[in-house]
Swiss-Prot record:
It comes from Xanthomonas oryzae pv. oryzae (strain PXO99A). It catalyses: (1S,2R)-1-C-(indol-3-yl)glycerol 3-phosphate + L-serine = D-glyceraldehyde 3-phosphate + L-tryptophan + H2O. The modification N6-(pyridoxal phosphate)lysine is found at residue 98. Belongs to the TrpB family. It holds the Pfam family PALP. NCBIfam families: trpB. This is Tryptophan synthase beta chain. Tetramer of two alpha and two beta chains. Disulfide bonds: none annotated.
Length: 405
């Protein structure tokens, strides 16, 4: 935890892309130029009213924003304690928060004259969102995806192909999200002249952590205004799942300077942190460099990245966005591990009480919100980011429960 309290969280990152001791730009010399070009283009675009207007128009008419806040009354009664509210990002076009970011980056790619976009994906939602905006803007799209994730997310793989994208299986390493990101980086280095890399989470070298955060920050801005309009006050606590952490930082950002709002991130504890089969980078990791930024990573005593595990492909990543590492160290946010079993139980409870199938990623946040609600009085408000819908996970859940579909 930082020695001195931080009065303004919006002062970060600094000009070099650092969130305290985290973040930065640790990349090969060949990527310095492209990253500088991207940073300059983004800083120019975000100050351009016409770019902002185009982005806002797409969020409204294409994505379907604003997404509502739903009071999960039956779930709240079943759990006891505080009232659980759901920010319904699962209702967005493509079924998750990911399109908030891909729309912004794809518009930036077109503005920069790029004709080819590449992306990495774990659960497949970012791949689907990237393929979707590529089709809309007439851009070529390649999506790198770990072979392990392809097996557990066949529906999203086919969705990407239906949208015209090429899906490249990655078999190196653990054949999951980190390996897909590695391969996408290699592609970008080779084809930087005509290619734009749409990173799906708040990781990577600067400017990606702040750019992806900014494009997802609509979630928190909406939620803050909706809470004040519908409930006359801010929530007592907010919760979101954290792998890389894009949906979480999207919700958290609008509340960072509100000390009365407690912030919680749900990491993937897998089979339990003590077993070593997890993906809880903050709870069980240590500072290191991964994919171009300094953050908390899961590694061995020699600093080598180790394999992770989560039932959720989107959380199965051995690092976390540098802003989350910073928020944890500063004490502003608390990150807790949620096991596979806890996420599964939350998935079923939400389905049975509210008729909502949450993504396995989002189910980690639902499980955390249930725990928080049980510790708070009945009039307290817990806002949970329901970052995606669970259609993509039906086969995974059935297989875990011994059912063949």
């Amino acid at each position: 935890m930082s020695a001195q309290p931080i009065s303004d969280f919006y002062a970060y990152p600094d000009a070099a892309g650092h969130f305290g001791k985290f973040g930065g730009r640790f990349v090969a010399e060949t990527l310095i130029g492209p990253l500088q070009e991207l940073s300059a283009a983004y800083d120019q675009a975000r100050q351009d009213p016409s770019f902002i207007a185009e982005y806002d128009k797409d969020l409204k008419h294409y994505v379907g924003r604003p997404s509502p806040i739903y009071h999960a009354e039956r779930l709240s009664r079943e759990v006891g304690g505080a009232q659980i509210l759901l920010k319904r990002e699962d209702l967005n076009h493509t079924g998750a928060h990911k399109i908030n970011n891909t729309i912004g980056q794809a518009l930036l790619a077109s503005r920069m004259g790029k004709t080819r976009i590449i992306a990495e994906t774990g659960a497949g939602q970012h791949g689907v969102a990237s393929a979707t905006v590529a089709a809309r803007l007439g851009l070529e799209c390649l999506v790198y995806m770990g072979a392990t994730d392809i097996e557990r997310q066949k529906i999203n793989v086919y969705r990407m192909k239906l949208l015209g994208a090429t899906v490249i299986p990655v078999t190196s390493g653990s054949a999951t999200l980190k390996d897909a990101l590695n391969e996408a980086m290699r592609d970008w280095v080779t084809n930087v002249r005509d290619t734009f890399y749409i990173i799906g989470t708040v990781a990577g070298p600067d400017p990606y952590p702040r750019m992806v955060r900014d494009f997802n920050a609509i979630v928190g801005r909406e939620a803050r205004a909706q809470m004040l309009e519908d409930y006359g006050r801010l929530p007592d606590a907010i919760s979101a799942c954290v792998g890389g952490g894009s949906n979480a930082i999207g919700l958290f950002h609008a509340f960072l300077n509100d000390p009365g709002v407690k912030i919680y991130g749900a990491e993937a504890a897998g089979d339990g942190i003590a077993t070593g089969r997890h993906a809880a980078s903050i709870a069980a990791g240590r500072p290191g460099v991964l994919h171009g930024n300094r953050t908390y990573v899961i590694c061995d005593d020699d600093g080598q990245i180790t394999e992770t595990h989560s039932i959720s492909a989107g959380l199965d990543y051995p690092g976390v966005g540098p802003e989350h590492a910073f928020l944890s160290d500063s004490g502003r946010a608390v990150y807790q591990g949620i096991t596979d079993d806890e996420a599964m139980a939350a998935f079923h409870l939400l389905a049975h009480t509210e008729g909502i199938l949450a993504a396995l990623e989002s189910s980690h946040a639902v499980a955390q919100s249930i725990k928080l609600a049980r510790e708070l009085p009945k009039d307290a408000l817990v806002l949970c980011n329901l970052s995606g819908r669970g259609d993509k996970d039906v086969h995974t859940i059935a297989a875990r429960e011994g059912l063949a579909l």
